[in-house]
Amino acid sequence: MSQIEFKDVNKVYPNGHVGLKDINLNIEKGDFAVIVGLSGAGKSTLLRSVNRLHDITSGDILIEGKSITKAKGNDLLMMRRNIGMIFQHFNLVKRSSVLRNVLSGRVGYHPTWKMVLGLFPKEDKVKAMDALERVNILDKYDQRSDELSGGQQQRISIARALAQEPAIILADEPVASLDPLTTKQVMDDLKKINEELGITILINLHFVDLALEYGTRIIGLRAGELVFDGPASEATEEVFNDIYGRKLKDDEKLGVE
């Protein structure tokens, strides 16, 4: 049984734009799967459909053999709890401390009223501190999040996802706004999490060299259709030219020197 399974998935937006077309795709446990393609190819739509930030129009998406497409109420909450999310623009509460932001990854485990009052048990604080240590910013735990650099803020968001104790992490262009050195640090963090904790990573990346360096698997989308799915070792320049529908530009190839 695949960890994530797309079955004949289609997404059509209200304006008629086709986001995804007839997607059949399996993601296996422990994959570091990188989604590539032009802007507007459907990368974010595919990624965000996994935890239903975007609902699909038809088809089904299964997580561990169970339909998240059909899940409702508490069942949906329990399934989402198992899926961490990292965004391009961090999505942090800027005036809150680093620790408080990471603790927000635990909200799915407790009643809403406790979370509003900030009543996190000691075990949650231990998990949050462990997550911060794993991404090497434990020493910043009591600082305001908006006092830190972009790279450090992205590491907070990774720690928040880790504190959630997910089986899957979705990362939507997590390094798009970062400089090359910070990009490498963040990508190294994600790869380490994947290899050491066995957490499946499904990530959108703009730069082809990053996809090849870090991905075990490349998923290519063009105009909402799946045009390549295979090991990174098989993703040749010709394959990428086909995914993009043209030769790659220099600023699409190189992310980290």
Swiss-Prot record:
Q: Name one GO molecular function term.
A: ATP hydrolysis activity
Please list the residues that bind ATP.
G37, L38, S39, G40, A41, G42, K43, S44
Keyword Cell membrane in record: yes
The similarity comment for this entry is: Belongs to the ABC transporter superfamily. Phosphonates importer (TC 3.A.1.9.1) family.
So what does this thing catalyse? Answer: phosphonate(out) + ATP + H2O = phosphonate(in) + ADP + phosphate + H(+)
Annotated PROSITE patterns: ABC_TRANSPORTER_1, ABC_TRANSPORTER_2, PHNC
Compartments (UniProt record): Cell membrane
Q: What is its EC number?
A: 7.3.2.2
Report quaternary structure and partners. The complex is composed of two ATP-binding proteins (PhnC), two transmembrane proteins (PhnE) and a solute-binding protein (PhnD).
Q: What does this protein do?
A: Part of the ABC transporter complex PhnCDE involved in phosphonates import. Responsible for energy coupling to the transport system.
Gene behind the chain:
phnC
Per the UniProt record, the lineage of the source organism begins with:
Bacteria, Bacillati, Bacillota, Bacilli, Bacillales
Protein name (database record): Phosphonates import ATP-binding protein PhnC
- NCBIfam families cross-referenced by the UniProt entry: ABC_phnC
